[in-house]
């Protein structure tokens, strides 16, 4: 599963090497992280914490690397994705699909946040992110 996500992520990053952290936690730890990092005292399914792209969108970072051998540059540090396994399992049952499919959905959702997509910035941004999420999930199903 992780390998397939790596293939998708490299495709989205135009084969530039990247690194990201993935933390799988329970609802209790997710609630603590959400409270500390976002001021929300509740659990959630997935959180993303970007590193390099807080001030520079991904496209700007990639443009600066254009023309260079991607293997000669250090990997792009995307950030961290935190997934609550407890919530993942509950949502898989509620939605009616496999734990694997829900894991893919949450990982892709978190990854897109690391790339600068944000469904919380309005309806148009939400629509764009949903389209990209569906596109990525379709690619994963084909791998």
UniProtKB/Swiss-Prot annotation:
SUPFAM superfamilies: Metalloproteases ('zincins'), catalytic domain (SSF55486)
Disulfide-bond pairs as recorded: none
Keyword Metal-binding annotated: yes
InterPro entries, A to Z: MetalPrtase_cat_dom_sf_prd (IPR023091), YbeY (IPR002036), YbeY_CS (IPR020549)
Subcellular location: Cytoplasm
Family the UniProt entry places it in: Belongs to the endoribonuclease YbeY family.
Protein name as catalogued: Endoribonuclease YbeY
């Amino acid at each position: 599963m992780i390998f397939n996500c790596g293939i998708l992520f490299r495709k989205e990053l135009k084969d530039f090497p990247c690194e990201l952290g993935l933390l799988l936690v329970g609802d209790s730890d997710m609630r603590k992280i959400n409270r500390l990092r976002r001021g929300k005292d509740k659990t959630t399914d997935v959180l993303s914490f970007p590193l390099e792209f807080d001030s520079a969108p991904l496209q700007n970072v990639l443009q600066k690397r254009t023309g260079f051998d991607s293997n000669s540059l250090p990997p792009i540090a995307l950030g961290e994705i935190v997934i609550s396994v407890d919530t993942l399992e509950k949502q898989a049952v509620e939605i009616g699909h496999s734990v694997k499919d829900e894991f893919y959905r949450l990982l892709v959702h978190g990854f897109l946040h690391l790339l600068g997509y944000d469904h919380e910035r309005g309806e148009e941004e939400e629509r764009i992110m949903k389209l990209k999420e569906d596109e990525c999930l379709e690619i994963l199903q084909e791998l």
